[in-house]
Regions:
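Intrinsically disordered, metal-sensing/regulatory segments
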Residues: 1-218
Length: 218
């Protein structure tokens, strides 16, 4: 419910606040989410991942970092709150697909937790990951809803698309519940490492980014 509500909250912020207040809120939400993600990464998630004594943890984290970099090539950086609006533009389905893949991947470790796969991990680690996703989803939903309302979609259809996006992380959780990493030739350390690498890329980009007109160029 929390995963769904965080996205709905982002949509409500866009539709209720005026442009000035919305811009101010986005900046504050981004700064908080970036700082919160970095804090839980270095205080809980990364130390506990390395305690698992996996031999390739660093490689998994780097893979997640690079996967996020590739996804942002198609999404334009909306994962860290950046949206480039052109009034009346067509619905950017490539961006939506990229953002959906990101959300599904980050939900998988939560599902694995509930199956008991990581019962040996501290409960605080799971809670940190959950709240990290929650606080990350709000500014992403704000940016996505802002973009949707600038397209040729009606307001009702924009809410439908946002609702579809809201279902993506729970879909990842369901996948993690139904399929163990070993069933697809992976392990939990690999999946969590990839997710943490993605979070590391997003949080550092939020913290160190200074240009409001930032975009990724390849």
């Amino acid at each position: 419910i929390g995963l769904l509500f965080s996205v709905v909250l982002g949509g409500l912020i866009v539709t209720t606040l005026n442009a000035s207040n919305k811009s101010h809120f986005i900046k504050l939400a981004l700064a908080f989410s970036g700082g919160f993600l970095l804090a839980i990464l270095f205080e809980h998630l990364l130390p506990e991942l390395y305690e698992s004594k996996g031999t390739s943890v660093g490689l998994y984290i780097l893979s997640g970092f690079l996967i996020q970099l590739l996804l942002e090539y198609f999404s334009g950086g909306i994962e860290h709150g950046h949206v480039h609006v052109h009034k009346g533009q067509a619905m950017p389905w490539t961006l939506f697909l990229s953002l959906s893949i990101h959300s599904i991947i980050e939900g998988i470790p939560l599902g694995n937790h509930y199956t008991g796969i990581i019962a040996h991990h501290a409960h605080e680690s799971h809670e940190s990951l959950f709240w990290g996703i929650i606080f990350h989803q709000v500014p992403v939903a704000i940016a996505l809803m802002t973009l949707l309302l600038s397209t040729s979609l009606s307001k009702a259809k924009a809410w439908i698309v946002l609702g579809l996006f809201a279902c993506m992380t729970p879909l990842g959780v369901c996948f993690g519940l139904a399929v163990t990493p070993e069933q697809i030739g992976l392990n939990f350390q690999m999946i969590l490492g990839v997710v943490l690498g993605m979070f590391l890329h997003i949080s550092t980009t939020i913290i160190f980014e200074t240009s409001e007109n930032h975009k990724f160029n390849f």
